[in-house]
Amino acid sequence: MKRTGRQKDIVTPEKKQEQRELLRLFSANIRKILKNTDLLADDLQEIRLRTGAPLLVVAKDQEYFLTPDGALTGEWEKGYPVSPTDIRDTMDYIGSFSLYAYEDELRQGFLTVEGGHRIGIAGKTVIEGEKVKSISHISCINVRVAHEKKGCADRVMPYLWEDGRFLHTLIVSAPGCGKTTMLRDIIRQISDGESPYPGLTVGVVDERSEIAGCYLGVAQNDVGIRTDVLDCC
């Protein structure tokens, strides 16, 4: 993903690697479009593919359509139309050509991939005994790009301790305001220990892989050195 000269972002080797990992999830056509856009992975929040609909991205809380040459537009008619082949190839890349290995996660309508990115899917659902048995003929893919904001909990941490004891804490906000991001950083700081607070053993029950973003059982997000995660339970 390139940047125009109007921005002076410093792209580290680590960031370049993250961008390459993200691009590898997509079909060749969409990968090319994303490479040509002037958005960095840090800007992107979601990349949405729907069969027959224009390619759509969410960046900095704004929706944009992407044209075939990677330009951002607010006019949906100019957006690149996602084809069934784009969907099929993208799912092949997401599942490393072994989607059967992700059947349990796919039944929930999402899976987590390397890097902590979460992939939501929609298609034909087969119900058995009031539970989803499988999802096939996938026609919609939503990639939620993983982001960490280390230090975002710095200002609240002093209020979460009393007499050397961590207090019961409830985080409340409107949707999309960063509750999970804040919680992840709180967990990291409790686990690592941040002066004057000692590091503590932390157990995380990550029902939808939103906090640790586990891939093959390993947390892709930094949740601290003393943290154990129960994923997808």
Where are these regions (language model features)?
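N-terminal accessory targeting/assembly segments
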Residues: 1-114
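Residue-level signature of catalytic and energy-coupling elements of molecular machines
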Residues: 47, 121, 206
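P-loop NTP-binding catalytic core
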Residues: 89, 97-166
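Hydrophobic anchor at the beta1->P-loop junction of P-loop NTPases
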Residues: 169-171
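The conserved Walker
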Residues: 175
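Conserved lysine of the Walker
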Residues: 179
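Hydrophobic positions on the alpha1 helix immediately C-terminal to the Walker A/P-loop
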Residues: 182, 186
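P-loop NTPase switch/communication element
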Residues: 191-233
